[in-house]
Amino acid sequence: MYRTHRQHSLLSSGGVPSFIGGLVVFVSAAFNAQAETWFDPAFFKDDPSMVADLSRFEKGQKITPGVYRVDIVLNQTIVDTRNVNFVEITPEKGIAACLTTESLDAMGVNTDAFPAFKQLDKQACVPLAEIIPDASVTFNVNKLRLEISVPQIAIKSNARGYVPPERWDEGINALLLGYSFSGANSIHSSADSDSGDSYFLNLNSGVNLGPWRLRNNSTWSRSSGQTAEWKNLSSYLQRAVIPLKGELTVGDDYTAGDFFDSVSFRGVQLASDDNMLPDSLKGFAPVVRGIAKSNAQITIKQNGYTIYQTYVSPGAFEISDLYSTSSSGDLLVEIKEADGSVNSYSVPFSSVPLLQRQGRIKYAVTLAKYRTNSNEQQESKFAQATLQWGGPWGTTWYGGGQYAEYYRAAMFGLGFNLGDFGAISFDATQAKSTLADQSEHKGQSYRFLYAKTLNHLGTNFQLMGYRYSTSGFYTLSDTMYKHMDGYEFNDGDDEDTPMWSRYYNLFYTKRGKLQVNISQQLGEYGSFYLSGSQQTYWHTDQQDRLLQFGYNTQIKDLSLGISWNYSKSRGQPDADQVFALNFSLPLNLLLPRSNDSYTRKKNYAWMTSNTSIDNEGHTTQNLGLTETLLDDGNLSYSVQQGYNSEGKTANGSASMDYKGAFADARVGYNYSDNGSQQQLNYALSGSLVAHSQGITLGQSLGETNVLIAAPGAENTRVANSTGLKTDWRGYTVVPYATSYRENRIALDAASLKRNVDLENAVVNVVPTKGALVLAEFNAHAGARVLMKTSKQGIPLRFGAIATLDGVQANSGIIDDDGSLYMAGLPAKGTISVRWGEAPDQICHINYELTEQQINSAITRMDAICR
């Protein structure tokens, strides 16, 4: 049961907690009356002496002075939820919210425009209506909303989605550890195949100390026939530089790919952080699409490093949740099918035309050493600087430079906002390079980008671009190669089996590159997308080509999708083509359902079908069933059966996933080639967070996280999450918070134990990047008691206020027959009851509850006030 303790409670004659209708009506009337109102005590009791002092209500006061947790609404928009101190301004003016200049400024009121604010202390209560004409402050007691209204001219002019830096929270000091373990045990019955086991562990550890974030990403892997290997992928120290709207990084990171190709480095970088901008000023992230012909492992790499790995079912897939390390630069996508075959292709990614709003400056400065995972490249020092400036008339000017021992490059560009015709940008890069054979080269590269959304047609040209480079143009990465040609091998690769996708030849420099990304909404008929790229090279006719098409629609409950994928890379003997048809049909109406409404919302069941055909005419077909179980929908299973026309073999899989409060677990089994190849796979992921209040286990961490602290509210669900609940101490970690944005963190009051009440069920936080922000919930674990009070055999006065000693927020009001309802009471304590300001207008109730009374839904008892 949820109850706000800062709001006093009354009892109806039936004993159910509520406000006495008569008092509320008359208090409300008094609050809104223009003339002074007087309460006749005889209205409430025949004996006026049995009524408490109601003079405060005669002045229109609905509440007593104190701190109340309220929603703050500015011009009909909720801007914050926090504790506000209500004080008595003067006996004549009564009680009002104490709003300071500092708090009003944080809400978005333009206090600088009114000189009177500067004459007040920043912590002094502001008479808002006296300073800003037509301003008003109203407290809605029933909804606990502090409603502030000011003229629009007194509001700061901010972009949509803007959150002022004053509300950004650096978080608490903590030690963080995220882990992800996966393993597979394979059995191959054929003589030419080896059975084997493989294991992979990814550890993301870190320390938060004030605004500083220390992070390390390491992996451990072991396969049959190979020794175990640890890899340190990256380590860095990072912090936000709020005055510069930027971020300082010391250690391993990537440069942005807006101007020059993105490269991995180890060094120092100071760069603008677009996350600090409102959503309306931010760009887009890459989406990786493809088609799997079987239960496949998807690996996404950048600069030789694995940045993303997952398993997908047969059919079309889409990955849109890549980490920020892969926010620029081309991505290598590898699809490893169940039979061991690997299909790989490159997904180009560039930002939309590099436009900035007028006056906006975006910068990046890097002093570092080139970092690579390839044994074919050296690690040399380099420097890079870039700058963008939003000019007048919808223009953006940008440029940058790169400097290394064997490389010099400078670029300059200009972007235009063409209004209804979209946005374009054009830039040129001049480079001088010295290659591995000591040959010197000079060249230029020209790039054109275009983006446009046709709202009335539902068409989005998310990105159309073309780059042309002369034969003498090379990139910084090209000058890092130790040889003019060869095969790249990353640490741990089998050098006896080179892959065509790893071959490089500096003689074949890049020439022209065209890329297109178009999506179209068709209303009730669905939507389709078309994306493609083509890279040509000097001194060869070979090309890299990627073309993807997809159409998705909904026919009543049936979801239908069609997709086609074509990829051909330089050096690849033949192109890969896959056509796929998939559909899913919900089965909820056919399966037994829970009567619980909460469970019904969380449980789903659907049938899936995937059919794919490759360019050689081989067909794979899969039919599956997927269902979510348990009250929170955090247990799911999937069963699939398939057929492959190549070899006329059957395949199948079964898996189960459990998303728990302290970890996520998965186990699966699949077979192929009529059972001659079998595999058992399993995974476990989660986190451990050490902080000043203890150690908390949780689900996998995101970049930014929230620590819920609700002592007394153990095993309570977190709203809008799956499987997440507080531990035995009332703590849990909510992962994947959005940095520099308002995050609404809420506990599900319906899952509270019956002897627990929450003072606040919702906390709003605005974390900085990488922060672990504390969201505190005040839970009162204790008994709910209905007391029949008396003093010297006479019921206590109607309207008297009762307060639990030591807990000012926990209080109640005596009703018309002397009854008092209070919740969250400890087993033993003292309640003070006051019906006036005189020293003799107070008495005390000493009580002691049994264990049975504490655990009861409500306890009724007589109480003597002395």
Swiss-Prot record:
UniProt topology in membrane: Multi-pass membrane protein
Gene3D superfamilies, sorted: 2.60.40.2070, 2.60.40.3110, 3.10.20.410, Outer membrane usher protein FimD, plug domain (2.60.40.2610)
Induction text: Expression is negatively regulated by H-NS and subjected to cAMP receptor protein (CRP)-mediated catabolite repression.
GO CC annotations, alphabetized: cell outer membrane
Coiled coil: none
A single GO BP: pilus assembly
Keyword terms: Cell outer membrane, Fimbrium biogenesis, Membrane, Signal, Transmembrane, Transmembrane beta strand, Transport
Keyword Signal found: yes
Molecular function per GO: fimbrial usher porin activity; heparin binding
Cell inner membrane found in the keyword field: no
SUPFAM superfamilies membership: FimD N-terminal domain-like
Signal sequence annotation: 1-35
Subcellular localization: Cell outer membrane
InterPro entries on file: Fimb_usher, Fimbrial_membr_usher_CS, FimD_plug_dom, PapC-like_C, PapC-like_C_sf, PapC_N, PapC_N_sf
Domain of life: Bacteria
PANTHER family, per the entry: FIMBRIAL USHER DOMAIN-CONTAINING PROTEIN YDET-RELATED, OUTER MEMBRANE USHER PROTEIN
Function field: Part of the elfADCG-ycbUVF fimbrial operon, which promotes adhesion of bacteria to different abiotic surfaces. Could be involved in the export and assembly of the ElfA fimbrial subunits across the outer membrane.
Record's protein name: Probable outer membrane usher protein ElfC
Species assigned in the record: Escherichia coli (strain K12)
Lineage, opening ranks: Bacteria, Pseudomonadati, Pseudomonadota, Gammaproteobacteria, Enterobacterales
